[in-house]
């Protein structure tokens, strides 16, 4: 099965109550709930962490400062600025007490999206920020920021991606990316990718329905 569930609060029509229910649905499974928030701020991050998210994806990390803000929003003081609210999440993860939960919060995965030409230009500074676990290249927004909307295979987009890949591979963090097929996933693994997002809900439903109907005699 899947190792992690991508819950999208940036583009998806998902409020915090729905997010909490999705996180709770993973209880008892080996699938870790990871939530994409709207920006690297405590206001957006704290509720999803208090709901039990095991990872947070931050969009549009374009500078050292925004990367540092992402880390600060996830970590408790003194490493960060997250407020203390150990109520729902400890019960979700069966932590015996709040101190145990405080210590385990260091295991929350922080994922930085590299999805803008500004991020490419600042990639060396961004990848030096301690606390970011995964630097995830998002090609569609990146292509748009370069002026090639919808064309992730444009030479300039590929050049930008290659620059980011090379820098991330030398950093402390893992290299992540989107895959729209198993073959693309295998290619990325061969290229050093360690974290893969294997599609999304609408795509998976479309592929499943198409596969079923294509095999139907009608």
Residue locations for each model-derived region?
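Hydrophobic faces of well-ordered beta-strands that scaffold small-molecule active sites
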Residues: 5-7, 33-37, 56-58, 110-115, ...
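Conserved anion-binding
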Residues: 43, 58-130, 144
């Amino acid at each position: 099965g899947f190792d992690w569930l991508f819950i999208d609060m940036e583009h998806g029509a998902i409020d915090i109550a729905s997010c909490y229910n999705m996180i709770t649905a993973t209880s008892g499974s080996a699938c870790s709930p990871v939530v994409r928030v709207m920006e690297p701020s405590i206001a957006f991050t704290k509720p999803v962490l208090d709901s039990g998210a095991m990872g947070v994806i931050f969009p549009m990390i374009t500078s050292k400062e925004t990367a540092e803000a992402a880390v600060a929003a996830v970590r408790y003081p003194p490493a960060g600025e997250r407020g203390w609210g150990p109520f729902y999440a400890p019960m979700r993860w069966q932590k015996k007490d709040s101190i145990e939960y405080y210590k385990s919060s260091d295991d929350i995965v922080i994922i930085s999206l590299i999805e803008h030409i500004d991020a490419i230009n600042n990639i060396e500074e961004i990848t030096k920020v301690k606390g970011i676990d995964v630097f995830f290249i998002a090609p569609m927004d990146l292509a748009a920021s370069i002026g090639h909307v919808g064309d992730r295979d444009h030479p300039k987009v590929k050049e930008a991606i290659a620059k980011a890949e090379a820098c991330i591979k030398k950093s402390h963090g893992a290299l992540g990316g989107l895959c729209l097929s198993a073959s693309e996933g295998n290619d990325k693994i061969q290229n050093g990718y360690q974290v893969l997002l294997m599609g999304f809900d609408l795509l998976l439903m479309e592929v499943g329905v198409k596969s079923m109907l294509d095999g139907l005699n009608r």
